[in-house]
C-alpha cells in the first residue's frame, strides 16, 4: 500500500513483517548489539519500501517504551503507516505495561497470526 507523508511517498510491503525479540542485535557484546539495533531501526526509516508490521516481544518490548533510544525512529515509522505491535505479556513481565510509548499492545495469538500469514519475516 502507499501513503503520502508530507511531500514524500511511502510504500509498505504487505508481505513483510519485522520481528524484534531483544533490545540488542546479534550475539557477542551486548552494548555493541544495542548500537546495532538502534542503527537497524533507523535504517528501516530510510528504506524505500517499509514493512507492514514490526512485532516486539521478549526483550524487544523494551524498545517501544519510555527511555528507549529507538522511540523517535519507531514513531516516524508509525507515522508512515507501519503497524507497531508489542507483546502485552512481555511488557507485564518487564514491568513496562504503563510505559509503552509507540504502537499498541498485542497478544501471542496476533503475533503468531502475523508471522504465519506473511511471506517475508525479517529478524535482525
Where are the predicted features?
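Short, glycine-/small-residue-enriched flexible loop/hinge segments at domain edges that mediate gating
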Residues: 46-62
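A glycine-rich helix N-cap at a beta->alpha junction
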Residues: 70-96
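Short, glycine-rich nucleotide/cofactor-binding loops
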Residues: 17-37, 59-66
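C-terminal structural segments of small proteins and small subunits
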Residues: 98-117, 122-123
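Histidine-anchored nucleotide/phosphate-binding helix
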Residues: 32-49
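Fold-independent oxyanion-binding glycine-rich loops
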Residues: 20-23, 57-60, 87-90, 124
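Short amphipathic alpha-helical segments and helix-helix/interface helices
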Residues: 41, 71-75, 112
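Single conserved hydrophobic/aromatic residue that forms the stacking wall/gate
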Residues: 1-11
Amino acid at each position: 500500500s502507499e501513503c503520502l507523508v508530507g511531500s514524500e511517498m511511502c510504500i509498505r510491503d504487505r508481505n513483510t513483517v519485522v520481528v524484534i525479540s531483544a533490545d540488542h542485535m546479534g550475539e557477542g557484546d551486548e552494548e555493541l548489539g544495542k548500537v546495532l539495533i538502534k542503527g537497524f531501526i533507523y535504517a528501516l526509516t530510510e528504506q524505500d519500501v517499509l514493512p507492514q508490521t514490526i512485532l516486539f516481544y521478549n526483550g524487544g518490548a523494551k524498545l517501544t517504551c519510555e527511555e528507549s533510544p529507538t522511540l523517535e525512529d519507531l514513531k516516524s515509522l508509525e507515522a508512515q503507516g507501519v503497524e507497531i505491535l508489542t507483546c502485552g505479556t512481555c511488557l507485564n513481565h518487564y514491568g513496562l505495561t504503563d510505559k509503552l510509548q509507540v504502537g499498541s499492545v498485542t497478544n501471542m495469538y496476533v503475533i503468531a497470526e502475523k508471522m504465519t500469514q506473511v511471506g517475508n519475516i525479517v529478524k535482525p
